Each structure stands twice: as structure tokens, then as C-alpha cells.
UniProtKB/Swiss-Prot annotation:
It comes from Bos taurus (Bovine). The gene is PSMA7. Transmembrane segments: none annotated. The modification Phosphotyrosine is found at residue 153. This is Proteasome subunit alpha type-7. It comes from the Eukaryota. NCBIfam families: PRK03996.1. Its main location: cytoplasm. Glycans are attached at residue 130.
Length: 248
């Protein structure tokens, strides 16, 4: 029997192949990074180069779900659009029903449950996306969650998904400290440094969004990103000079 044809059939060694193939689709997607700071959450995404005549504003990997929650994704953009639309409707429905915005965990659990349902019924296939969901709860606590195509979700301090996730995650494990997220600017720089591990052409291929407590999502413009990249390059040069002085 071909176990990779039926979505609801386990292989003898316990695999659901269609779910694993969806996870492979995520690994081919653009790299996305999320970092939870003290009073800020930051999402960064590797931007693919667009066609010369294409409007790049229509190619977005970061979007707001509600005033206090936003998400970045890696994987199939068309699948992400369905998940985003469903999540936005759920956020609005929650506001109308209980007159409060959703918590970040609530909407993460909703998205994870939606994905999980698509792994358990015939005539459907799993969503080929992983998502980083960030925001603030109404007590002002910053949150970062990650979901995958199987419908599992976890809370993180910092995480990465997509093509370069492994090397970016290794970078974050080494460099994420309380000092590294002491200020908003340092948190933003940490995300940019993490993305520069896999993005070759500097700031012009990075999309960055920040959300601060009681403030809406802000997408940074290319000039702001280039300013941070220039500061990072300058810091690198100064550190190299210090190392050379010590060596001599």
C-alpha cells in the first residue's frame, strides 16, 4: 500500500507522509524570524526579489490579524491567505462576542486547531505553512508562538522558520540574552543580524515589522532597515579592529 497517498493513514513506522511533505514545503519557503523583547515583538522575513514590473507591496509575508496580534509565515502563500482570512474573522467574532481582543495564545490555538483538522479528513490536504504569531495580551505581556502544518504550537522567546531556519536558530541560541533585548533597538538589531546569516544582499532583501505595547503593527521602510544594517556593519568593523589590536 502507498502510505503517502492517503492523508488519514499512518505508515507502519508511525508516519503521516502528507503532513511531513507539507513540512518540507515550509522548508522551501522564505526564512522568517520572530523575537520577543521586553516591551516589543519583532518579526523579520527574507524578501524574495520580485519581477521588474511587479508591485512589491502585493508580496507580503507579514500581516496583522488584529490590533494586538500579527503573524509571519513560511511556505505556500495561497495556503497562508486562507489561514489569515479565517484567523481575522475569528478575531472579529471574539471582539463582538466578549467585547475584548483575543489573547495571542487564543488565536494561535485557533490556527493550530484549523491546521490539525486538515490532517484528519479525506478530500483535503494539510496547509503547507508554518507561522510565527506575535503580539501583546491585554495585561501588556509580549508573546511569540510558532505553529507547524501538523497543528502543534509552542511558545518561544525567539524562533525561525523556513529555508534558513536551522542556521538562524543556531545563531539565536548563541546570541539571545537579556542584554541583547535590553532596548527596542537592540531587539530589532538581533532580528536583522539573525536574518543576515542567510540573506546575502543586506537590508534591501529584508522585510521587518515591529509591534510595541498599546501600539499598532509598524512595517519598517527600507531606509530604516538600511540604517540598522549600517550600524551593525559599523559595530562589526569596530569589533574586528579591537580583536586585531589584542592579537598584536
Amino acid at each position: 500500500m502507498s502510505y503517502d497517498r492517503a492523508i488519514t493513514v499512518f505508515s507502519p513506522d508511525g508516519h503521516l507522509f502528507q503532513v511531513e511533505y507539507a513540512q518540507e514545503a515550509v522548508k522551501k519557503g522564505s526564512t522568517a524570524v520572530g523575537v520577543r523583547g521586553k516591551d516589543i515583538v519583532v518579526l523579520g522575513v527574507e524578501k524574495k526579489s520580485v519581477a521588474k514590473l511587479q508591485d512589491e507591496r502585493t508580496v507580503r509575508k507579514i500581516c496583522a490579524l488584529d490590533d494586538n496580534v500579527c503573524m509571519a509565515f513560511a511556505g505556500l502563500t495561497a495556503d497562508a491567505r486562507i489561514v489569515i482570512n479565517r484567523a481575522r474573522v475569528e478575531c472579529q467574532s471574539h471582539r463582538l462576542t466578549v467585547e475584548d481582543p483575543v489573547t495571542v495564545e487564543y488565536i494561535t490555538r485557533y490556527i493550530a486547531s484549523l491546521k490539525q483538522r486538515y490532517t484528519q479528513s479525506n478530500g483535503r490536504r494539510p496547509f503547507g505553512i508554518s507561522a510565527l504569531i506575535v503580539g501583546f495580551d491585554f495585561d501588556g505581556t509580549p508573546r511569540l508562538y510558532q505553529t507547524d502544518p501538523s497543528g502543534t504550537y509552542h511558545a518561544w522567546k525567539a524562533n525561525a522558520i523556513g529555508r534558513g531556519a536551522k542556521s538562524v536558530r543556531e545563531f539565536l541560541e548563541k546570541n539571545y540574552t537579556d542584554e541583547a533585548i535590553e532596548t527596542d533597538d537592540l531587539t530589532i538589531k538581533l532580528v536583522i543580524k539573525a536574518l543576515l546569516e542567510v540573506v546575502q544582499s543586506g537590508g534591501k532583501n529584508i522585510e521587518l515589522a515591529v509591534m510595541r505595547r498599546d501600539q499598532p503593527l509598524k512595517i519598517l521602510n527600507p531606509e530604516e532597515i538600511e540604517k540598522y544594517v549600517a550600524e551593525i556593519e559599523k559595530e562589526k568593523e569596530e569589533n574586528e579592529k579591537k580583536k586585531q589590536k589584542k592579537a598584536s
